Amino acid sequence: MESSNLYSKLLNAPKNTPVFLSQNLEADFIVKAYTFGLFPWTSKPVTWWCPDPRCVLNPNQIHIQKNMKKFINLYQIKLDYDFLKLITLCRDARSQSWIDDEFITTYYKLFTQGYAHSLELYENNELIGGIYGLILGKVFFGESMVNIKKNASKVAMIKLCDLLKPYDFIIDCQVYNQHLEFMGAHNISRKEFLNILKEKCNQESGFKNFKDLIT
């Protein structure tokens, strides 16, 4: 299907239900799908979503609550250090998770290809939280966050925003929740989101390697 036809179909797709189903997750298809605002959520079959409205966060608009300031520099930050361990932790920390073995295998492949990235938090060399997602152009497509220690996921988002601020990024948070709203995220229409992707996914990120943003 041509890009223009897919764009038109997505504008009229269901707002709060899957747009379509697939039997398997394929790394190459995921990269293409993300540029059209689609993301997988649950497997067997894989459900593909493009919700309307869409929750996004501008790194320059991150809200840092007063009670968070004491946590910001409490943990060591590492980038792309142990992606596999972080995504596994995101799965294991939840009693019910869409992140199954197929998700882990596929997203780890995307990591080895340079698309998927992780920001990890450590305390005494122990992984205690973080966030992972895909970077395409100037968009960070957030997939999942986790915290083992108090406020670790919030610190991860704050640190991610700090790193991406100089590069005019937008962070895709997928679906609204109060936790994200407190941090400065907000909803926009699907049409506005897809227009942002048209522009930003075709731009250079502005840096060579994500992991080198922390020296």
From Swiss-Prot:
Family matches, as Pfam families:
Leu_Phe_trans
Highest rank taxon of the organism: Bacteria
GO biological process entries: protein catabolic process
> Which subcellular locations apply to this protein?
Cytoplasm
GO CC term (a single one): cytoplasm
Catalytic activity, EC? 2.3.2.6
Give the keywords, sorted. Answer: Acyltransferase, Cytoplasm, Transferase
For this protein, what is any one GO molecular function term?
A: leucyl-tRNA--protein transferase activity
Q: What class of enzyme is it?
A: transferase
Reactions that this protein is recorded to catalyse: N-terminal L-lysyl-[protein] + L-leucyl-tRNA(Leu) = N-terminal L-leucyl-L-lysyl-[protein] + tRNA(Leu) + H(+); N-terminal L-arginyl-[protein] + L-leucyl-tRNA(Leu) = N-terminal L-leucyl-L-arginyl-[protein] + tRNA(Leu) + H(+); L-phenylalanyl-tRNA(Phe) + an N-terminal L-alpha-aminoacyl-[protein] = an N-terminal L-phenylalanyl-L-alpha-aminoacyl-[protein] + tRNA(Phe)
Its job = Functions in the N-end rule pathway of protein degradation where it conjugates Leu, Phe and, less efficiently, Met from aminoacyl-tRNAs to the N-termini of proteins containing an N-terminal arginine or lysine.
What name does this protein carry? Leucyl/phenylalanyl-tRNA--protein transferase
Q: Which organism is it from?
A: Campylobacter jejuni subsp. doylei (strain ATCC BAA-1458 / RM4099 / 269.97)
